[in-house]
Design a protein with these regions (language model features):
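Active-site lumenal/periplasmic loops and adjacent helix-entry segments of GT-C-fold
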Residues: 25-115
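Start-transfer (signal-anchor) and selected internal transmembrane alpha helices
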Residues: 1-29
Length: 115
């Protein structure tokens, strides 16, 4: 049987390798450009998080009603609000475009550690 230290060392080195690969392939320099991220269904997420920051957080709400699509719908009643909360926290320091991209890339990197 392998000793615990060997298992931990191999696990840590494997995670560091995956993190290095992510850093090499992700364009970190583009994260800190203040523009709107696009691609896939990213626009839908931007609208929802922007509504969360501009309409809900000034009233200290986690969820509420949004008139952005479908003649109105309940926003964040049936959807996970943590990405919007994280973006709001980063938006206190960075512009919205940068805060959104930091949250997006942070979730990609943290997936490595959840495996």
């Amino acid at each position: 049987m392998k000793s615990v230290s060997k298992i931990l060392n191999s696990n840590i080195s494997q995670q560091l390798f995956y993190l290095l690969v992510l850093v090499l392939f992700l364009r970190i320099d583009l994260v800190f450009e203040n523009n709107t991220p696009t691609g896939g269904d990213m626009g839908a997420h931007i609208v929802a998080i922007d509504t969360f920051i501009k309409d809900f957080m000034p009233n200290l709400q986690i969820n509420g009603w949004s008139n952005d699509w479908f003649g109105g719908y309940p926003l964040y009643y049936f959807y996970f609000p943590l990405p919007a909360i994280i973006t709001f926290i980063f938006n206190l320091v960075f512009p919205f475009g940068i805060a959104f991209k930091i949250m997006d890339e942070m979730s990609t990197i943290l997936v490595v550690y959840s495996i």
